[in-house]
Regions:
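GST-like domain detector, emphasizing the conserved glutathione-binding G-site
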Residues: 1-100
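GST-like fold's C-terminal all-alpha helical module
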Residues: 72-167
Length: 167
């Protein structure tokens, strides 16, 4: 495992992926896999006896993971990068780093509404979903029951993203 910075620059990642900047990335031999859902399928192919796509629930867990990776992730971005959260953040060591990050994000999302969500809406969805998950996880070890599935991994990265600075 290689640890990389949470925010750009990520020179080791960029060299490995030829410019792809998102994480996670999986390297198996000379092959590079980008995108969580693709990586999970590749790993699942290596260990089919412990699939994170249970045969009896593959459609529902795939749909839930997609919702989590898109809608909940969008809410996570809004919650994680609200001004109040950034004020005491260790990610941004100084004002210059914060300004560079914001300029990078503006360039990355230019002309797109894919990663934007109004903060009040994001907080409402985040709180509601996390409350439901907390209740469900008080009765089972994993979102899907007794064993982890793709939804657990998709949810984990959203939580990690929001709580990275509070650990």
């Amino acid at each position: 495992m290689v640890e990389i910075p949470v925010i750009m620059p990520k020179p080791d990642l960029m060299a490995l992926t030829g410019g792809y900047r998102k994480t996670p990335v999986l390297q198996v031999g000379a092959d590079i896999y980008c995108d969580t859902s693709i990586i999970c399928k590749v790993i699942d192919d290596f260990y089919p006896e412990k699939s994170i796509y249970p045969a009896s629930k593959e459609a529902s867990v795939s749909a839930a993971a997609y919702w989590t990776d898109t809608f909940l992730f969008k809410a996570s971005v809004a919650v994680a990068f609200q001004p109040k959260a950034l004020a005491g953040s260790e990610i941004f060591s100084d004002q210059e780093t914060a300004a560079a990050f914001m300029a990078d994000r503006a360039e990355l999302s230019k002309g797109s509404t894919e990663l934007s969500m109004e903060l009040s809406i994001a907080q409402s969805h985040w709180s509601m979903h996390m409350g439901r998950l907390e209740l469900q996880l008080s009765q089972a070890s994993f979102i899907g029951g007794d064993a982890p599935n793709i939804v657990d991994f998709s949810t984990y990265h959203c939580c990690w993203f929001v709580y990275i600075d509070s650990a």
